[in-house]
Curated annotation (Swiss-Prot):
Family: Belongs to the TolB family.
Subunit details: The Tol-Pal system is composed of five core proteins: the inner membrane proteins TolA, TolQ and TolR, the periplasmic protein TolB and the outer membrane protein Pal. They form a network linking the inner and outer membranes and the peptidoglycan layer.
Organism field: Pseudoalteromonas atlantica (strain T6c / ATCC BAA-1087)
GO cellular component entries: periplasmic space
Protein's recorded name: Tol-Pal system protein TolB
Gene3D superfamilies: TolB, C-terminal domain, TolB, N-terminal domain
Signal peptide residue numbers: 1-23
Top-rank taxon: Bacteria
Pfam families, per the entry: PD40, TolB_N
Subcellular location: Periplasm
PANTHER family per the UniProt record, alphabetical: PROTEIN TOLB, PROTEIN TOLB HOMOLOG
A Gene Ontology BP annotation from the UniProt entry: cell division
Length: 451
């Protein structure tokens, strides 16, 4: 059983969760530049209806990636279910680059065999799917138009999860980058205090808002969830005891461990890349400073020493430095401290303010909140040349979190007077909003790869 399967299975047993999405992605910009692709409805070889449509989930995943535009099934010249049934000349008019075909066959009580094949439509049009190549001195079918072909057996509850797996395969084969459709997001939901005894809720859900699960509810604020690098724990800040404290919660056992209870500020916990340390902000010595705590021993090391406020730490991918926000230059800007030498250098200079910096997994860019002419927007800075690109046009943006493949950013913003989550691609072309059905949503955190 995979790590993600174990976590999801445990949560479904011990917690009351909604299988429907209380967050639903609404795409607002970016489809025109996406690549056309065909996700043919999978053939159902059983009685009644398929437990869940794999093709619909895959189409939704690829559409929300901002890189693909699945064509409507009514625009398909047919609905083949394997590569042998494809009429490449008929498909040429659709302009698609790739075609996904597949089938689902019941194999016993709650067991279903899924077959799928990803076909290079352009190569198939050239060869007709009948390319030949020399192998061992003989001409054989090369199948060089087949990009991937797999089969597996799943349960009825595993349809949606396996559809995300198919999406990952398609995405990686066509972009060369790992897909992030099997990931999850954590966030805080705030409901009306007058009508809810526990208005603050810490929630995790699939990346697309489905399978929402409440981990914790509280009468007092919850904030700043942060995933461990193995995806099994969350660190967060709670005011349950009328003061800020940092906890780590295990997603297998749901057990909670209090990490800090210092006087003053205890905030902004974030796991190191190896999961052994936790960076945080503490004001126990009088001024908000950056600290690093060893998770096992709780031993603390103070990192910054400055009269200005230092906050919002994040780790560089190699774990050797921290990025943080500081007012030491007058207005909040982003700095970098080397943990071996304690040398600090300023990273951002453009704009009135820059806050909440996080470096992309490849180390090439930094995502942050940029304030220019009084507007707070999500921006990305090229760390080689220092150029900053403003990515969003939304209002009062905050708390950006990057997908583990570096392709997308989730953040909190104000829309029609409510805090909602939004998505923007790293190049700024694709934009979407995740409006909540109830309450305000903030402090998003994207999980690492869970498999």
């Amino acid at each position: 059983m995979t790590r993600l399967t174990r976590v999801l299975t445990f949560l479904s047993v011990v917690l009351t969760a909604s299988s429907q999405a209380s967050l639903e992605i609404v795409i607002t910009e970016g489809i025109d530049s996406a690549r056309p692709i065909a996700i043919v409805p999978f053939k159902w070889n059983g009685p009644g209806q398929m437990p869940e449509s794999l093709s619909e989930v895959v189409s939704g995943d690829l559409l929300r990636s901002g890189k693909f535009s699945p064509i409507d099934s009514t625009d398909m010249p047919g609905q083949p279910h394997n590569d042998n049934e494809l009429d490449y000349s008929a498909w040429a008019a659709t302009g698609v680059e790739a075609i996904l075909v597949g089938s689902v066959t019941p194999e016993g009580p709650d067991r279903y065999r899924v077959n799928f094949t990803l076909v290079d439509a352009i190569r198939g049009q050239i060869t007709g799917g009948n390319a030949r190549a020399l192998s061992g001195g003989k001409l054989t079918n090369s199948n060089d138009h087949i990009l991937d072909s797999r089969q597996t057996v799943i349960t009825g509850q595993g349809f949606r999860q396996y559809a995300h797996r198919i999406s990952d395969v398609v995405y990686e084969k066509l972009t060369g980058e790992k897909g992030a459709f099997m990931t999850r997001i954590a966030y805080v939901v705030v409901r009306d205090r007058k009508t809810n005894e526990f208005p603050y809720q810490l929630v995790v859900a699939d990346y697309d808002g489905v399978n929402e699960t409440m981990l914790l509810r509280s009468k007092e604020p919850l904030m700043s969830p942060s995933w461990s690098p193995d995806g099994t724990k969350l660190a967060y800040v709670t005011f349950e005891n009328k003061r800020s404290q940092i906890y780590i919660q295990d997603l297998y056992t749901m057990s909670r461990t209090q990490m800090t209870d210092f006087p003053g500020i205890n905030s902004a916990p974030v796991f190191s890349p190896n999961g052994r340390q936790l960076a945080m902000v503490l004001s126990k010595d009088g001024n908000p400073e950056i600290y690093v705590m060893d998770v096992a021993s709780k031993r603390l090391e103070r990192i910054t020493r400055n009269r200005a406020i230092d906050t919002e730490p994040s780790w560089t991918p190699d774990g050797k430095s921290l990025i943080f926000s500081s007012e030491r230059g007058g207005k909040p800007q982003i700095y970098r401290v080397d943990l071996a030498s304690n040398n600090v250098r300023r990273v951002t200079f453009d704009g009135e303010m820059n806050l909440g910096g996080t470096i992309t997994p490849d180390g090439g860019r930094m995502v942050m909140v940029n304030r220019t002419r009084g507007n707070y927007h999500i921006a990305a800075q090229d760390l080689e040349n220092g150029n900053i690109q403003v990515l969003t046009k939304t209002y009062l943006d905050e708390s950006p979190s990057i997908a583990p493949n570096g392709s997308m950013i989730i953040y909190s913003t104000l829309h029609q007077g409510k805090q909602v989550l939004s998505l923007v691609s790293l190049d700024g072309r694709f934009k979407a909003r995740l409006p909540a059905s109830d309450g305000q949503v903030k402090s998003p955190s994207w999980s690492p790869f869970l498999l």
